[in-house]
Amino acid sequence: MRIPPPLSNNKNRNRRYKRSQFEVIFEILHIIKEGEQIKTRIMYAANLDWRNFSKYIDFLISNGFIKKNKEKFELTELGKKLYSSLYELFEIMNSKP
């Protein structure tokens, strides 16, 4: 399953672009979906500073989308469902009429 570029049809993509919370969550889930990941790998791959990384990771853990095993994070079944739902949403948003 390839990762769809969230909102790739956005005309302002070349300008400084602020990602939505859904896009950031999707990127984090996609990174973790590739296999258990340490926090530094997720933070750099998702292009997040420590403050924002902590906010999103805390949200995902507290809502049961990911879990932490020792120093690594992995998706839960609920997290896999969220990933699939966001994937479908971005596919629909990127489709042309």
From Swiss-Prot:
Q: Which SUPFAM superfamilies does its entry note?
A: Winged helix' DNA-binding domain
- Xref: Gene3D superfamilies: Winged helix-like DNA-binding domain superfamily/Winged helix DNA-binding domain (1.10.10.10)
Q: Which domain of life is it from?
A: Archaea
What InterPro entries does the record point to?
ArnR1-like_HTH, WH-like_DNA-bd_sf, WH_DNA-bd_sf
Please give the name of this protein.
Uncharacterized protein MJ0287
Organism of origin: Methanocaldococcus jannaschii (strain ATCC 43067 / DSM 2661 / JAL-1 / JCM 10045 / NBRC 100440) (Methanococcus jannaschii)
